[in-house]
Amino acid sequence: MPRVFLVRSRRPQPPNWSHLPDQLRGDAYVPDCSSLAVPPAHRSSGLRDTWAVSSQGTLTSAPKGPGTLGCPLCPKAFPLQRMLTRHLKCHSPARRHVCHYCGKGFHDAFDLKRHMRTHTGIRPFRCGACGKAFTQRCSLEAHLAKVHGQPASYAYRERREKLHVCEDCGFTSSRPDAYAQHRTLHRTT
């Protein structure tokens, strides 16, 4: 089987989603609740609140603790807006990011990128103690705790070290200078 590598490249033009209905097009679909009754106490409070649709079809304030954002479609709550936005994609039937090897669809580009590692064999998270490599950071952290008895104490930059992959032969390097030097070998041959 030929080796295949995930390479970032620009599309000739952005995809056109105009043929899809609105609820399938947006990053996060929140249904139009303008026809539902908003409780009078919340109309003029000036507070931004999170709403959920009750079984009777009326808006109710979603359960949340201090500093959390509730999903308007299910009981889950999140501490950050970006986490809520990502979660809202799971309620949409549209899966824009499709694996061209197996056809599996994903709501998020990051999930597709992580999935592609199963096809490419790229394992960017390496254990410093034994050298074993993993496709996901959480797998490395679990390995460190279970096998080496180390709690995960990596700095963000160490965890997210970029792996440079040659699309021609599969050469990998974490150092951009080594990757650039390798690429010159392909240009000379």
UniProtKB/Swiss-Prot annotation:
This is Putative transcription factor ovo-like protein 3. Keywords: Metal-binding, Nucleus, Repeat, Zinc, Zinc-finger. Pfam families: zf-H2C2_2. May act as a transcription regulator. SUPFAM superfamilies: beta-beta-alpha zinc fingers (SSF57667). Residues 1-20 are annotated as: Disordered. Gene3D superfamilies: Classic Zinc Finger. It comes from Mus musculus. The keyword Hydrolase does not apply. Its main location: nucleus. GO terms for molecular function: zinc ion binding. It is found in: Nucleus. A zinc finger (C2H2-type) spans 69-91, 97-119, 125-148, 164-186. Belongs to the krueppel C2H2-type zinc-finger protein family. GO terms for cellular component: nucleus. The keyword Hydrolase does not apply.
